[in-house]
Structures are given as C-alpha cells and as structure tokens.
Amino acid sequence: MNSRLIVTGTDTGIGKTVFSAALCHALGAAYWKPVQSGLEEETDSEIVARLAQASPQRILPEAWRLNTPASPHLSARLDGVEIRPEEMHIPATSLPLVIEGAGGLLVPLNDKTLFADLFAIWRIPAILCARAALGTINHTLLSLEAMRSRDIPVLGVAFIGEANEDTETTIAHLGRVKRLGRLPLLDDLSPEKLHHSFARNFHIDDFAGVAR
C-alpha cells in the first residue's frame, strides 16, 4: 500500500508548506491540500509545485478553494458555503501522498468540526511541524496531547527555524515523541537549496517506511 502522511502544525505560518514541498520532493510524492483559504496570492499547492519541482499530475486538486485568507470555517462562511468533512475523501493516487492541513491542528472547518477531528477519522500518521523559538514547548506539547486524545498516529515532530537544542530535546523527552529533524530558515528559498537542506537535516527512512 502506498505511503500517506499528514503534515500539520502548532500554528499558522510556521513553514508547513515549505516542509511539505521538501518532503514531497524527497519521497517523489503527490501533494494534496484539502482546504485552501485565500486565492489572490500564490496558493500552497502552487508553492509546493514550484519548490518540489513537481509535475502537475503530482499536485492533486483541493477539495475546497476559498477566497478569503482566514480560518477555513470563516473563509467558507464569507464565501457562502459550508465545509462538509464527511464529503472530503482522500484522493486516489499511485504515488506516496503528503496531505497538508490548514493553519494549526485545532483550526475549525465548520461550527462543529476541527481539522484534528478529520485527521482522527483518517487515522493517517501525522508529522507535527513546530517552531524552534521561545514558547514552542508549550504549543508543541499541547498539540501532541490533542493528537493523542483523538488517537491520531504521531510520526514525530519536525522543527522549523534556528537551532535550539534544549527546546528540541525537552519536547522529544516530555512529549515522548520522535525528533525527526530541523529545517532551518533559508535566506534564498530556491528548490535546490531546500532539497539540499532537507537531505542534510532529515533521514528519509523515517518517512519512507510509513504505509496505511
């Protein structure tokens, strides 16, 4: 069975999409963003296609494309629609698949359902992206508790940002979670530099053996 992985995060804007692009390139995976909020600027699917140097066939169409860059429940409301998670089915592909959530783990899809609730239904191993900056211990441990309370399989934590050895070690120990690696912030975010940085800081075997 083909590998499927979820990429989620402790917050919005922490680098999930850049990490997803690097992971897609490393695995030769397809990419799916179930909900895209905000269409005026480059979308996350377009960013991944560019940074992963992925063919159009590897970028699967979003289930929901919403105009306003906001939490999915609000963006949908402003568009006059309601996101129905029960109708959101994982697309079929012959490739490994990276699924990226929107915003943080507990972002609402509608008035009743959080993204984490959808992940709990899918039961696909999830990577939690976390900042390596001050405050991330609290955010990351809370996110891990939320995942485990829903029986979401946790593959590990991917840190993003400048090195903070004590913080990363503390989270791995107290959170009882695998420390997958750390993706540093790149001044020149080119596909080549991103691919090289990912290969230098992560072990592909930590991701390639996952199958559901």
Swiss-Prot record:
Pfam annotation, one family: AAA_26
Binding site for ATP: 13-18, 100-103, 184-186
Active site per database record: 33
Entry's Gene Ontology molecular function annotations: ATP binding; dethiobiotin synthase activity; magnesium ion binding
Main location: cytoplasm
Entry function: Catalyzes a mechanistically unusual reaction, the ATP-dependent insertion of CO2 between the N7 and N8 nitrogen atoms of 7,8-diaminopelargonic acid (DAPA, also called 7,8-diammoniononanoate) to form a ureido ring.
Family listed: Belongs to the dethiobiotin synthetase family.
Protein name in the entry: ATP-dependent dethiobiotin synthetase BioD
Organism whose genome encodes this protein: Brucella canis (strain ATCC 23365 / NCTC 10854 / RM-666)
Taxonomic lineage: Bacteria, Pseudomonadati, Pseudomonadota, Alphaproteobacteria, Hyphomicrobiales
Protein encoded by which gene: bioD
